[in-house]
Amino acid sequence: SNKEISKMIESKGYSKEVVTADSSEPKSIDEIKRRGIFRIRPARKGKDSILNGIQFIQQFKLVIHPNCTQFRVELENYTWKKDKSTGEYINVPSDTYNHGIDAFRYSLSEIQRNMKKKIRATSRIY
């Protein structure tokens, strides 16, 4: 519940930090704000944001804490959809084993956006 989420954020000492939440639940974000987590904000999702976020994550070697067992399960089972006629994998992620991965993508979205800005700024032709 949103009440439990708010309490968990508070108990971990993150109530004053920026928290990025799934933007598909604006009412939940509003409720969590009312519960004192004022810096919660919706994730910005654009065209192909899932695919772009996954490709961004794939650039890095991830080190997963042993206690993060569910996240490890998701990473090990994350898969791509198959073309129904050919059976070949297509460049579309399946909508399974992805809740933790989605949260991870949201947490990195600002870093990814800032990196793109730096690349655009330094790649101008003068």
Describe each PLM feature range.
Residues 94-126:
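Charge-patterned, long linear interaction tracts outside catalytic cores
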